[in-house]
């Protein structure tokens, strides 16, 4: 059984390695997820005159920034380099936004897009939870925080639809 190895004292080396790589992988997911959220809000913020929508965008952007910084700090602590979204990924999101807002910059359309994005973010969180089971409790907690935030965000955007 696993009972006696739990202390970490007899933990086989490869299990420790797995824990490190799961920590790093999950933190990278958080970095990319929060970066996409932040960048998307940045881009959409300039398209609306709806002050209530803008206020909600600002609130969420600050939360994405906070979570992003926490993930960066945690990566630094384990000696890993944060890998943000690739330029190609950023470009593709940006093009998608421009295409979908070209003819319709209404609050309803922007809120719909943001709700979809938040929903996708929640799915990405859930996938990461499953993919990196060995991540430490602190890293899992940060991912759960992001997931809870995006679940609430999705609800917030639905109010505007």
What are the residue ranges of the model-derived segments?
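Aromatic (phenylalanine/tyrosine) cluster motif
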Residues: 9-10
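Carboxylate-rich helix-loop segments that flank metal/cofactor sites and access channels
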Residues: 69-122
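Preference for long, well-ordered alpha-helical segments
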Residues: 110, 117-161
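Alpha-helical scaffold segments that form or flank carboxylate-/histidine-based iron centers
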Residues: 22-30, 51-69, 107-114, 136-150
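Conserved alpha-helical segments that form or flank metal/cofactor-binding pockets of metalloenzymes
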Residues: 52-88, 157-161
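Amphipathic alpha-helices that form helix-helix packing interfaces
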Residues: 30, 37, 44, 67, ...
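Alpha-helical bundle segments that constitute or directly flank the non-heme di-iron/ferroxidase center
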Residues: 16-48, 109-133
């Amino acid at each position: 059984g696993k009972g006696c190895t739990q202390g970490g004292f007899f933990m086989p080396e490869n299990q420790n390695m797995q824990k490190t790589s799961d920590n790093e992988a999950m933190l990278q997911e958080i970095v990319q997820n929060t970066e996409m959220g932040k960048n998307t809000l940045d881009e959409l913020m300039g398209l609306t005159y709806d002050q209530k929508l803008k206020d909600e965008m600002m609130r969420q952007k600050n939360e994405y920034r906070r979570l992003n910084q926490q993930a960066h700090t945690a990566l630094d602590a384990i000696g890993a380099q944060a890998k943000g979204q690739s330029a190609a990924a950023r470009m593709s999101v940006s093009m998608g936004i421009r295409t979908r807002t070209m003819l319709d910059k209404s609050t309803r359309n922007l809120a719909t897009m943001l709700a979809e994005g938040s929903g996708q973010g929640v799915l990405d969180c859930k996938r990461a939870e499953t993919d990196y089971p060995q991540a430490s409790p602190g890293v899992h907690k940060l991912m759960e925080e992001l997931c809870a935030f995006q679940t609430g965000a999705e609800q917030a955007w639905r109010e505007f639809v």
